[in-house]
Amino acid sequence: MHIKPEEITSIIKNEIKNYEKELETVDSGTIIQIGDGVARVYGLEECMEGELLEFPNQVFGMALNLEQDNVGCVLLGSEEGIKEGDIVKRTGKIVEVPVGEDLIGRVVNSLGQPIDGKGPIKNDGYRAIEVPAPGILERSSVNEPLQTGIKAIDSMIPIGRGQRELIIGDRQTGKTAIAIDTIINQKGKDVICIYVAIGQKQSTVANIVNTLTEEGAMDYSIVVTASASESAPLQYIAPYSGCTMGEYFMNKGKHVLIIYDDLSKHAVAYRTMSLLIRRPPGREAYPGDVFYIHSRLLERAAKLSKENGGGSLTALPIIETLAGDVTAYIPTNVISITDGQIFLETELFNAGQRPAVNPGISVSRVGGNAQIKAMKQVSGTLRLELAQYRELASFAQFGSDLDKDTQARLEKGKRLIEILKQDQYKPMAVEKQIMIIYAAVNNFLLDIKVSDIKRFEKEFLEYMDTHHREIGKAILDKKVLDDELKSALESAIVEFKKIFLM
C-alpha cells in the first residue's frame, strides 16, 4: 500500500491532536528505616497526622509522628517483604472501617475484615475510626435503663442507656462474665451489642463467640477482635473501629451496647507503639497523651436527643488491676472519665460470692435517673443494710454475746448476700429481681435457712410464673409498686412460704 507524504503528515497531526497524556500526581516518600512494625519515611511533605499510607505488598500504615525531615508510621499489617528504599504513597484518607447491618452476627478484625470464614460482608460504606464525640446540644440526659440481668448491679449500681460504666477488678474475678451476661440479657430488647476483644487469647475469644452463639446472642452482636498475636497498632485501633460500627446504628436512632475488653491492654499496646516511634515516656513509661486516647474513645458514648434520633451508645470498658490497686495510673484515668465503676474483689470471689461486686466502692453516677421506680423502692435500703452487715460481721467474729437486734441484722444480712448471688449466663428479668429482693428486704426470708435460700428463690420464681404471672406483668406495666401491688406480692410470698416450709 502506497502512502503519500502529505497523508503521513496529516496522520501525524491527527495523532498529536488526539493525544491525551494521563498524569497522576502522587505524594510519595522513601522508607529510610523499618522494623518492629514501625517505619520512618523520608519525603512525605504534605502528610497529615493519622493519615493512611500505602506501603508495598498492599500493606497500609498510619502516620503518627510528623517530624522535620521524616514521618514516623506504624504498619497495620505484616512488614514481610518491605525494605528500606521502598516507595510509600499518601492516600489522603484516614483509617476507615466498613459499617452496616450485615456486620451483625459476624466476627471481624480491627479493620472490619471478616475472620469467621462466613464469606465477605456487604457494607453500607466506610466511616473514619476517629470522629468527634457528640456535642452538648446533641445529647440528652441518661433516662432509660439498660438492664444487665444481674441482681447486684440492677439494684445497687444501675446502668442507663448512653452511660459509661467501668468494670474494674483483678484478673479472674468475673469481669468478662458480667459483660457477656449483659449482652445475653439484651435478647429481645432491640439493643445491638458490640464486643471488642483487645489483646485477648484467640481461644478465649472463640469461647466467647461460642457462648454468644449458644445463647442466641450473636443474632444482634458484632465481635471485633485484635488478639494478643496481632501487632500493637491493630490492638490500638480496635476499640475505635468497634465504636465507629456502633455509632452507625446510634445515628439511625437505635440503641447500642459496646464492651471494651480491656482498656489496660489497649494502653499497653499504645505504650508499645509510642516507645517504638520514640515518643518521650511519662509515668509508668506511658506517653503523655494516654489519658486522651481513652477520653476521646469513651466520650463517644452518648444518649442522643430526640431531634437527633434519640439513639444511644452505652460503653462498658473493662480495666484489669494488679492486687486490687485502683490507684494505679490507667485505673484512675478511666475511673475519672467514666460515669461510675463496678468494682470486683478477689476476696469476695474466693468466698463464693459471685458476681463478686463490692457495693461499698462501686457507684453509678447517672444510672439512678434511669432506674425504674419499682426497683428504687425495693433496693433503697439494700446498700446500707449490706454495709451494716459487713461491719457487724467483722465485730461478731470477736464475741458471741450479741443482742437480739444485732443477731437479727446479721441473719438478714446473710440472706441478702445469698439473694445477690447469681449463676453465670443466667441473667434475670427485672420484674423477677424486684419480687425476690422485695421478699429479702422486707424480712420474709428470716425463717428460711441460709442454705435453702437458693432453692427458695428458684422455686418461688417458678411459682410466681405459673400462679401469679399477672403480678410480674403489673410491675412491668406500672413500673412502680403501689399499695395494691405490694399486698398482692406479699400474700403471694406468704402463700408460697407455706408450701415451701411444709
Swiss-Prot record:
InterPro entries: ATP_synth_asu-like_sf (IPR023366), ATP_synth_asu_C (IPR000793), ATP_synth_asu_C_sf (IPR038376), ATP_synth_F1_a_nt-bd_dom (IPR033732), ATP_synth_F1_asu (IPR005294), ATPase_a/bsu_AS (IPR020003), ATPase_F1/V1/A1_a/bsu_N (IPR004100), ATPase_F1/V1/A1_a/bsu_N_sf (IPR036121). It is a peripheral membrane protein. It is an enzyme of class 7 (translocase). ATP binds at G169, D170, R171, Q172, T173, G174, K175, T176. Pfam families: ATP-synt_ab, ATP-synt_ab_C, ATP-synt_ab_N. The keyword DNA damage does not apply. Its main location: membrane. It catalyses: ATP + H2O + 4 H(+)(in) = ADP + phosphate + 5 H(+)(out). GO terms for molecular function: ADP binding; ATP binding; proton-transporting ATP synthase activity, rotational mechanism. Its EC number is 7.1.2.2. Keywords: ATP synthesis, ATP-binding, Cell membrane, CF(1), Hydrogen ion transport, Ion transport, Membrane, Nucleotide-binding, Translocase, Transport. It comes from the Bacteria. The record marks S362 as: Required for activity. It is found in: Cell membrane. Disulfide bonds: none annotated. One of its GO terms (cellular component) is plasma membrane. Produces ATP from ADP in the presence of a proton gradient across the membrane. The alpha chain is a regulatory subunit. HAMAP family: ATP_synth_alpha_bact. F-type ATPases have 2 components, CF(1) - the catalytic core - and CF(0) - the membrane proton channel. CF(1) has five subunits: alpha(3), beta(3), gamma(1), delta(1), epsilon(1). CF(0) has three main subunits: a(1), b(2) and c(9-12). The alpha and beta chains form an alternating ring which encloses part of the gamma chain. CF(1) is attached to CF(0) by a central stalk formed by the gamma and epsilon chains, while a peripheral stalk is formed by the delta and b chains. Belongs to the ATPase alpha/beta chains family. This is ATP synthase subunit alpha. It comes from Clostridium perfringens (strain 13 / Type A). The gene is atpA.
